A protein has these predicted regions:
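Short beta-strand segments at enzyme active-site cores
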Residues: 1-10, 39-43, 113-114, 236
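Catalytic alpha/beta core domains of metabolic enzymes, predominantly
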Residues: 64-198
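Alpha-helix N-cap and loop-to-helix initiation/capping positions
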Residues: 14-22, 85-95, 150-154, 207-214
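Active-site beta->alpha loop and helix N-cap motifs at the rims of alpha/beta catalytic domains
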Residues: 16-91
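Structured C-terminal cap/extension of enzyme domains
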Residues: 122, 157-162, 184-244
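Glycine-rich, proline-tolerant flexible connector loops at the mouths of alpha/beta enzymes
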Residues: 1-23, 142-143, 201-205
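Alpha-helix-loop-beta-strand connector modules within alpha/beta enzyme cores
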Residues: 12-41, 97-100, 104, 158-166, ...
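Short secondary-structure transition/capping segments
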Residues: 12-17, 51-52, 77-78, 125-127, ...
Length: 244
């Protein structure tokens, strides 16, 4: 389960929290409710100060933590030509990536390399070849951000061809009607599947999802239609080279 920590005060739940005590409270609740679950922590933060996410990694010790593997101008334009939000740089220079990787190595977290564009996929291979990272490569193709890779299934063979040897991979599909053909093709090509309200509000039939659970039920259906079955937590740990 991929987790973003949020402030717990009334009316503040839309705001992120990097307080370790909050992170531990959330993590404990999830682990108690779902024994054996693989905990995947978000780490995305703008700017050079990564002390908040780092403190949460050290406190929670997630099995997986997001490793944003390159920078991106994070942009979106509305239909009337106005910016959806002020243009921003999601800055992830090599020095920042290296600092996160060091902490993940120290705490035993598997880095999930978040790749927003083709060049970032290629960068992960360079991290391995340069020795910046020496563990199992697990890549997440983030597709559908307007200033990144489009949520186009035709891109998948190209991206798969750029994977480091032995890598596992998955797709985060962002958008509306375009995300489900992408999930379907990911399942057919052997990739891992993920979804949630962070990435889409809509089910394959166009209805608005009422919960993450409805989205998960839909994506499980796609996996089975492609002749695949969902892994148990133990099977997923083995596949991702995580401790049992």
């Amino acid at each position: 389960v991929h987790v973003h920590y949020r402030q717990q005060a009334a009316g503040k739940g839309h705001l992120p929290s990097w307080e370790p005590t909050v992170a531990v409270e959330i993590a404990q609740a999830i682990r108690e409710a779902c024994p054996g679950i693989i905990f995947n922590q978000s780490t995305g933060i703008v700017g050079p100060d990564i002390s908040g996410p780092v403190a949460c990694i050290r406190a929670v010790k997630p099995e997986i933590a997001a490793a944003n593997a390159g920078s991106l101008n994070y942009l979106k334009v509305r239909s009337d030509g106005r910016w959806a939000w002020p243009p921003m740089l999601f800055d992830n220079p090599v020095e920042k990536v290296a600092a996160f990787l060091q902490v993940m190595q120290e705490t035993g977290a598997l880095p999930e390399f978040e790749c927003f564009d083709v060049g970032i996929v290629r960068s992960v291979d360079m991290f391995l070849r340069s020795g910046l990272y020496r563990g199992h490569p697990d890549l997440n193709f983030v597709m559908g951000v307007e200033s990144g890779m489009p949520a186009d299934p035709a891109l998948l063979p190209i991206l798969i061809g750029l994977l480091p040897a032995g890598a596992t991979w998955q797709v985060t599909a962002i958008g509306r009607e375009n995300v489900w053909p992408l999930h379907r093709r990911t399942a057919e090509l052997g990739g891992n599947l993920r979804t949630g309200l962070e990435d889409t509000f809509y089910l394959p039939d166009g209805r608005k999802a009422r919960s993450n659970g409805e989205l998960i039920d839909a994506i499980v259906g796609l996996a089975r239609a492609a002749g695949r079955e969902c892994a148990t937590p133990a099977e997923a740990r083995k596949m991702l080279h995580l401790a049992a």
